[in-house]
From Swiss-Prot:
It comes from Rattus norvegicus (Rat). The gene is Usp48. Residues 896-907 have a biased composition (Basic and acidic residues). Gene3D superfamilies: Cysteine proteinases (3.90.70.10), Phosphatidylinositol 3-kinase Catalytic Subunit, Chain A, domain 1 (3.10.20.90). Present in the brain, in particular in the postsynaptic density and the dendritic lipid raft fractions (at protein level). It catalyses: Thiol-dependent hydrolysis of ester, thioester, amide, peptide and isopeptide bonds formed by the C-terminal Gly of ubiquitin (a 76-residue protein attached to proteins as an intracellular targeting signal). This is Ubiquitin carboxyl-terminal hydrolase 48. InterPro entries: DUSP-like_sf, Papain-like_cys_pep_sf, Pept_C19_DUSP, Peptidase_C19, Peptidase_C19_UCH, Ubiquitin-like_dom, Ubiquitin-like_domsf, Ubl_USP48. Keywords: Acetylation, Cell projection, Cytoplasm, Hydrolase, Nucleus, Phosphoprotein, Protease, Repeat, Thiol protease, Ubl conjugation pathway. It holds the Pfam family DUSP.
Amino acid sequence: MAPRLQLEKAAWRWAETVRPEEVSQEHIETAYRIWLEPCIRGVCRRNCRGNPNCLVGIGEHIWLGEIDENSFHNIDDPNCERRKKNSFVGLTNLGASCYVNTFLQVWFLNLELRQALYLCPSTCSDYTKGDGIRGGKDYEPQTICEHLQYLFALLQNSNRRYIDPSGFVKALGLDTGQQQDAQESSKLFMSLLEDTLSKQKNPDVRNVVQQQFCGEYAYVTVCSQCGRESKLVSKFYELELNIQGHKQLTDCISEFLKEERLEGDNRYFCENCQSKQNATRKIRLLSLPCTLNLQLMRFVFDRQTGHKKKLNAYIGFSESLDMEPYVEHKGGSFVYELSAVLIHRGVSAYSGHYIAHVKDPQSGDWYKFNDEDIEKMEGKKLQLGIEEDLTEPSKSQTRKPKCGKGTHCSRNAYMLVYRLQTQEKNHTMVQVPAFLQELVDRDNSKFEEWCVEMAEMRRQSVDKGRAKHEEVKELYQRLPAGAEPYEFVSLEWLQKWLDESTPTKPIDNNACLCSHDKLHPDKISIMKRISEYAADIFYSRYGGGPRLTVKALCKDCVVERCRILRLKNQLNEDYKTVNNLLKATMKGSDGFWVGKSSLRSWRQLALEQLDEQDGEAEQSNGKINGSPFSKDESKEEKKEEEEELNFNEDILCPHGELSISENERRLVSQEAWSKLQQYFPKAPEFPSYKECCSQCKILEREGEENEALHKMIAKEQKTSLPNLFQDKNRPCLSNWPEDTDALYIVSHFFLDEWRKFVRKPARSTPVSSVGNAALLCPHGGLMFTFPSLTKEDSKLIALIWPSEWQMIQKLFVVDKVIKITRIEVGDVNPSQTQYISEPNLCPDCREGLLCQQQKDLREYTQATIYVHKVVDNKKVMKDSAPELNVSSSETEEDKEEAKPDGEKDPDFNQSNGGTKRQKTSQQGYVAYQKQVIRRSTRHRKVRGEKALLVSANQTLKELKIQIMHAFSVAPFDQNLSIDGKILNDDCATLGTLGVIPESVILLKADEPIADYAAMDDVMQVCMPEEGFKGTGLLGH
């Protein structure tokens, strides 16, 4: 099919030869493209918007042919959330709580601990006996033990694939968005659990933690002089083994028990010898628990970087561990079997993921617990190979050593759990207490109800999809109208009807109506012609309207469009004729004045005028494209039209007469004007003999006289006050001339206005008076103290020489005289200088002015500040910010030394016209205060400096983001300072940090870190590490 524009031209080509009054039904149907050939599927790739008979590519392809019924819904099979047979239940990861999930699974599979927790008294039994379940209330555990009871019961008998541990995590007060130290959390929770169970009356419950996890060792110190042995016995719940420099678990245990020599400054005070003696110290294992927890110290403190790091060394360990060689008392069995391996995936100590490999004590099978996902290992052996291959290899990493039968190697294991062999064999079934089972059954019932509800929703969606499929297959084939009776329906509605993701709404054709409530010819591109049979079914099923039959073809609109098209064609011919007439030489002086601007754009104005006529036809019944037309919108459009100049109005003066400016108009012939007048009958008409506006002539003469007078006044004032105009040789308090007794003050506003007039007297009004009253307070006093003028004061006042003041009094009307006199006080040489002002200072108002100035400096919006980037070896930040080894000032020698290095930084490669910026340090400001008043406070940028627009209420963090875009320095690499003060509170506003307009902030960027994992560590360590402060693990 031809492009839409070609179809548009073809639909109206007949208008070139047919007059409006000759339009027939055939012409109307051609304009509405009734008889265009329909497109064929497979040949037409996409829908032809210019052809109302093209019904291809409107969304029908997804319904034709075979359809997968799963596409009718977006609901997953609820049975996917069901627990698999002979499998375990997973735990939801709440964000960064995977380390908690691994410990919960390990503790759950400790049958003795689970049995003891089930024996704890609980408010849950009261809940099940009372009206809790019958009343439909949700059970809320109150204590840590109750949370574990309920969790373990669900893990044991729930029908769900995974459960939510958020109640338990909230009870501990853990932050689910922050990953904590897994090794520390294990110790703290074990301590909390023991403390909680120690209050139980049942000894099997009270002592379960000690019986299962508690062992004893002794710190034994032997004096080398007398041989005296001292012991310090201590309990342990896990052994913390150093892995650095070791390859096997047995080596780590041997180092843990290794004898240490105490010599030199580290000698031992022997109570028997009553003096410091050389000695040996070691740890002796006195007794071992049933469950032996071995912590592999993978996360250690790095003294060089100042934060934690992970040791990724491989450690070998066996499935069977004989601890007899390491125990002092040899009686009994000390052979342990591996029951759990806790893994940390990731190279950083501050991020990663935790999983657990745990052995089922009843079946002997190994399972991998990864939050919601539980995977059973093939066979009866532990398999760690997949986990060890997850991290990306690097050149510095060592190869994985070969492991023999019954042994394993891991660089990610951080905790090994061994069970005593006798304990491993003596396992019994643990039954869920009846009161807990009742809660589990209730949760299972909710889950089953949810499964039934989801299955029903899936079934309903599939049934609807099938019905829609049959409807589309039936109706789509009957959509083409051919030569049958037809109607028009919007393309958008047809597309939504074929879109399975959105419900079908009633048909709405209002947007396609013209002012005569018929189908607008211009809207045919968004309409489709369908058979009357299909339209009847659509309207009966979905409703809507209005129905657009063959009677909806609007003859009035077609006739009007024909008229406008013919006028546009005529316009093209007349445009050529007028151009030729304008080029021809005029005979005689008779003609008409036409504005040059109007002559350049008359064709465009005529076209717009024709388009407006077309638009007015749409608005004639109060609608635009079928939408109500508001009065407010019409008023705004009229106002805009009034502001735009119509044809030949560009030569009208303000009084509505012919303008006196001859450069803006030209004379055209009578014939040319006649052609133009056909299109603009209401245009102003000015024959060649028409006189210009008399009022404008009078004003022009007066303006010329005033301009000459202003120039004369400006020249006289400039000659009388040359230094004041050029801002040269200005007085200042620090260099008070000896032959001058007094200085005078005028407002800066007066100076600015006067200089503006003198520079451009023709465009400005002469300044007639000096308004010094604005510098005085309501009490008539002065609001400035001259020994301590601020930078803001200097923007308000200017000092004047006595000779200049005399001239000012002659040239201007002065309302208030403000005079400063300097006197020497005291006999000491040099004497102290004082300044006396007339009128006198008003202390209260001066204080108020200073407060207001400070307030204004800290309450600003869209003010300019400057950020100056310094490189590492520049000296500019050394003095004022020693913490960053930087300063806000530098000597000229320092600048010269730093120049070669500064040029290496791309932010320093800026042109500054070869000028050097003045000092902006504290010293520079002190010098400024000594001068008190200076002419220009304009900031001069230098290399490495960029201007930023900021507001007082934006935070330092937001400023750092702006700096990041300007300098390509990440916020965590930015070290900022102002006047020697480090800016480090990201939440503070710029106003509170003392950043005022025109401030210069120094930026020192940290060197980029190539190791992205290390960069993550830096990000984490920048935040104060609080560990488990404020959580339930510390008893809070």
